[in-house]
Amino acid sequence: MNIHEYQAKEILHKFNVPVPKGFVATSAEGVETQINQLKSDVFVVKAQIHAGGRGKAGGVKLAKSVEEAQQFVKNMLGITLVTHQTGPSGQQVRRIYIEEGSSIKKEYYLSLVVDPKLSRLVFIFSSEGGMDIEEVAKNSPTKIVKFDIDPATGFTNLDNSKLANNFNLNSEQIERITNIAKNIYDAFITTDASQIEINPLVETNSGDFVALDAKINFDDNALYRHPEIVQLRDYDEEVKEEIEASKHGLSYIKMDGNIGCMVNGAGLAMATMDIIKYYGAEPANFLDVGGGASKETVTEAFKIILSDSNVKGILVNIFGGIMRCDIIASGIVAAAKEMSIKVPLVVRLSGTNFEEGKKILEESGLNIIAADELGDAAQKIVKEVK
């Protein structure tokens, strides 16, 4: 689950990570009164969307007066911001965050993420803050250091020698960065986060370190433990089909193609999308029904797929392991009859009880196109759609 920058800063502030003072606005009303409560001559006006690249897209403005800040708020609210992370459709700006400006001496990058190879949490630190960390890693790898955390001991300390030798930091700077890192670690563990990123972490002219921007993602599987975090969810920032899918235990991601996919298992779903592209078409979605799909689940999956007007055909690709193919076939037939599916439907069943499943499809009286192999299934649906 993602949250907005202002929400991330509120959480970090509770864990004693220094952040600039600010407030969120959903309209221009009352902005002047709230700005006057900030102790600054310069204000940063930031569009709040669940995507990076806001600055380059015009979503971050520096205001040198209260009047200029008000005007920026009026100009930003309601616009559609297009960044390299939003896709061409962009995201509408419904919230603006206004905060005190900071005097910047130096920008750093600091994040805490899960490293799947090490099965540990890893801090990533760089002297090249404010930039795309992937580009820094590619072009200047020596400017990045990583510190993995032993889960048995938890956070103890950053490797001061690495910080000192790689970035020429003095003992006071290292101590302040280490304290912030410890507080980030505490926030990460306490909230069941999956990522905390501060970019940039700035050193001010007075020698303080401040989180100028913040991003926090949470582990969806742990949200049941954190109702207070669930309340931060902004459904306006999410695709409505993905929200509906999550209600039924389905993993759904909307894409730009015209062939809907219903598959069990994330790996098989990705392979299915790949082979659709291989044969010259584009998938309309990623949809994993999981290992225990029922008739009701299959029906909801069809509804979600067909809610996309771009879908011109559907490929169902099921491997019966835990899931029995005859049960899935019955669910497909029942859902197809209930919904009167008009687009071409290709079904490939393999695994447990697949022969019984194929028989159910054949005897259904519905125009369901059967396929034995994945390649065969992909070619058939591509042919039907073109």
UniProtKB/Swiss-Prot annotation:
<dbReference type="InterPro" id="IPR013815">
    <property type="entry name" value="ATP_grasp_subdomain_1"/>
</dbReference>
<dbReference type="InterPro" id="IPR016102">
    <property type="entry name" value="Succinyl-CoA_synth-like"/>
</dbReference>
<dbReference type="InterPro" id="IPR005811">
    <property type="entry name" value="SUCC_ACL_C"/>
</dbReference>
<dbReference type="GO" id="GO:0005829">
    <property type="term" value="C:cytosol"/>
</dbReference>
<dbReference type="GO" id="GO:0004776">
    <property type="term" value="F:succinate-CoA ligase (GDP-forming) activity"/>
</dbReference>
<keyword id="KW-0460">Magnesium</keyword>
<feature type="binding site">
    <location>
        <position position="199"/>
    </location>
    <ligand>
        <name>Mg(2+)</name>
    </ligand>
</feature>
<comment type="subunit">
    <text>Heterotetramer of two alpha and two beta subunits.</text>
</comment>
<keyword id="KW-0479">Metal-binding</keyword>
<dbReference type="Pfam" id="PF00549">
    <property type="entry name" value="Ligase_CoA"/>
</dbReference>
<dbReference type="GO" id="GO:0000287">
    <property type="term" value="F:magnesium ion binding"/>
</dbReference>
<feature type="binding site">
    <location>
        <begin position="53"/>
        <end position="55"/>
    </location>
    <ligand>
        <name>ATP</name>
    </ligand>
</feature>
<dbReference type="GO" id="GO:0004775">
    <property type="term" value="F:succinate-CoA ligase (ADP-forming) activity"/>
</dbReference>
<keyword id="KW-0547">Nucleotide-binding</keyword>
<feature type="domain" description="ATP-grasp">
    <location>
        <begin position="9"/>
        <end position="244"/>
    </location>
</feature>
<dbReference type="InterPro" id="IPR011761">
    <property type="entry name" value="ATP-grasp"/>
</dbReference>
<dbReference type="GO" id="GO:0006104">
    <property type="term" value="P:succinyl-CoA metabolic process"/>
</dbReference>
<feature type="binding site">
    <location>
        <position position="213"/>
    </location>
    <ligand>
        <name>Mg(2+)</name>
    </ligand>
</feature>
<dbReference type="GO" id="GO:0006099">
    <property type="term" value="P:tricarboxylic acid cycle"/>
</dbReference>
<dbReference type="GO" id="GO:0042709">
    <property type="term" value="C:succinate-CoA ligase complex"/>
</dbReference>
<comment type="pathway">
    <text>Carbohydrate metabolism; tricarboxylic acid cycle; succinate from succinyl-CoA (ligase route): step 1/1.</text>
</comment>
<dbReference type="InterPro" id="IPR013650">
    <property type="entry name" value="ATP-grasp_succ-CoA_synth-type"/>
</dbReference>
<protein>
    <recommendedName>
        <fullName>Succinate--CoA ligase [ADP-forming] subunit beta</fullName>
        <ecNumber>6.2.1.5</ecNumber>
    </recommendedName>
</protein>
<dbReference type="InterPro" id="IPR005809">
    <property type="entry name" value="Succ_CoA_ligase-like_bsu"/>
</dbReference>
<feature type="binding site">
    <location>
        <position position="264"/>
    </location>
    <ligand>
        <name>substrate</name>
    </ligand>
</feature>
<dbReference type="InterPro" id="IPR017866">
    <property type="entry name" value="Succ-CoA_synthase_bsu_CS"/>
</dbReference>
<comment type="similarity">
    <text>Belongs to the succinate/malate CoA ligase beta subunit family.</text>
</comment>
<dbReference type="GO" id="GO:0005524">
    <property type="term" value="F:ATP binding"/>
</dbReference>
<feature type="binding site">
    <location>
        <position position="107"/>
    </location>
    <ligand>
        <name>ATP</name>
    </ligand>
</feature>
<comment type="function">
    <text>Succinyl-CoA synthetase functions in the citric acid cycle (TCA), coupling the hydrolysis of succinyl-CoA to the synthesis of either ATP or GTP and thus represents the only step of substrate-level phosphorylation in the TCA. The beta subunit provides nucleotide specificity of the enzyme and binds the substrate succinate, while the binding sites for coenzyme A and phosphate are found in the alpha subunit.</text>
</comment>
<dbReference type="Pfam" id="PF08442">
    <property type="entry name" value="ATP-grasp_2"/>
</dbReference>
<keyword id="KW-0067">ATP-binding</keyword>
<feature type="binding site">
    <location>
        <position position="102"/>
    </location>
    <ligand>
        <name>ATP</name>
    </ligand>
</feature>
<keyword id="KW-0816">Tricarboxylic acid cycle</keyword>
<keyword id="KW-0436">Ligase</keyword>
<feature type="binding site">
    <location>
        <position position="46"/>
    </location>
    <ligand>
        <name>ATP</name>
    </ligand>
</feature>
<feature type="binding site">
    <location>
        <begin position="321"/>
        <end position="323"/>
    </location>
    <ligand>
        <name>substrate</name>
    </ligand>
</feature>
<feature type="binding site">
    <location>
        <position position="99"/>
    </location>
    <ligand>
        <name>ATP</name>
    </ligand>
</feature>
